[in-house]
């Protein structure tokens, strides 16, 4: 049985704070929904918490907005990564996220135990939730670790989930698509690979022989169209130990590509896993996190906003 939202918050001793500056929040993979109905911005990401703001400057949170059934594959308390909210015009708010059940091992590759991890869609009738599972028990193959699912409606009018096949199992991360049911309650057919980590001209790592090669990580896809109608995809990998974001463009204007990678990263070093949204004044924004180490060697991830220009043939960040 699912535990009520208020009960969960009380059990975990959550304290909601107000008037918190954006750069005081610690959050990976920040995704922002600008909700026209409430005239509020809602920020999700890794950790399963929600923040909200009227002006993108001062925020209220964190608030837990998800509920889970203990008998689902995710379990009662899954790890939650890279949550993002989408609207399709049907009145519902859809919560695309990556869920991990650490109690279930699906594979062992090169000595690494692969936990049960997959992208899934939850739904609520309010941006504040509670978001619950509403459709098929699974959206993606149970024998594969998948992550960072996002939503896109392609030129064929069909909805799709674009997601990553995790490098921990395939050692050459993939970017893939799968068709969603019209009401997003499940998937149709099999996934299709759009491109692989090895297609990147800018990512870097050292292989087992000490040779410099492409990095095997694919992370954080997000789809957009430019003012000229060109289809682009933001995605993230690494340049050695620096989190780095690139962009690819589809030559066909559809998810099927072929996808051509831009030769250089699109954001400064240390920024990645972004998405795009429009402010209420119409300005396009990029929500991204900065990935760095503090004085004690601990990883710190801080949300950051860039203004972007989509009016031309390419996405341009206003630095």
Mark where each language-model region is.
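Carbohydrate-active catalytic/glycan-binding domains of CAZyme proteins
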Residues: 8-319
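Bacterial N-terminal signal peptides
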Residues: 1-4
């Amino acid at each position: 049985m699912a535990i009520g939202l208020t009960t969960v918050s009380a059990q975990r001793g959550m304290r909601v704070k107000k008037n918190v500056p954006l750069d005081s929040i610690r959050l990976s993979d920040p995704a922002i929904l600008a909700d026209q109905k409430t005239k509020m911005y809602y920020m999700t990401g890794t950790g399963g918490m929600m923040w909200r703001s009227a002006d993108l400057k001062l925020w209220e949170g964190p608030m837990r907005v998800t509920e889970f059934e203990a008998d689902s594959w995710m379990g009662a308390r899954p790890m939650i990564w890279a949550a993002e909210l989408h609207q399709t015009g049907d009145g519902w708010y859809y919560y695309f996220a990556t869920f991990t059940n650490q109690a279930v091992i699906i594979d062992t590759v090169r000595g690494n135990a692969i936990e049960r991890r997959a992208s899934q869609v939850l739904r609520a009738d309010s941006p504040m939730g509670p978001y619950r599972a509403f459709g098929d028990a699974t959206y993606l193959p149970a024998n594969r670790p998948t992550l960072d699912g996002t939503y896109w409606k392609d030129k064929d009018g069909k909805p799709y989930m674009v997601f990553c096949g995790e490098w921990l199992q395939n050692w050459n991360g993939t970017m893939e698509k799968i068709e969603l049911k019209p009401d997003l309650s499940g998937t149709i057919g099999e996934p299709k690979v759009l491109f692989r980590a090895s297609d990147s001209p800018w990512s870097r790592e050292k292989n087992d022989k000490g040779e410099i090669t492409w990095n095997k990580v694919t992370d954080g896809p997000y789809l957009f169209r430019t003012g000229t109608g060109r289809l682009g995809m933001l995605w993230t990998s690494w340049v050695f130990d620096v989190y780095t974001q690139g962009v690819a463009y589809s030559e066909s204007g559809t998810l099927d590509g072929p996808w051509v990678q831009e030769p250089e990263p699109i954001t400064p070093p240390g920024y990645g896993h972004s998405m795009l949204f429009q402010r209420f004044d119409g300005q396009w924004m990029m929500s991204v996190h900065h990935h760095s180490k503090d004085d004690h060697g601990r990883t710190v991830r801080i949300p950051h906003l860039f203004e972007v220009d989509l009016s031309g043939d390419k996405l341009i960040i206003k630095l």
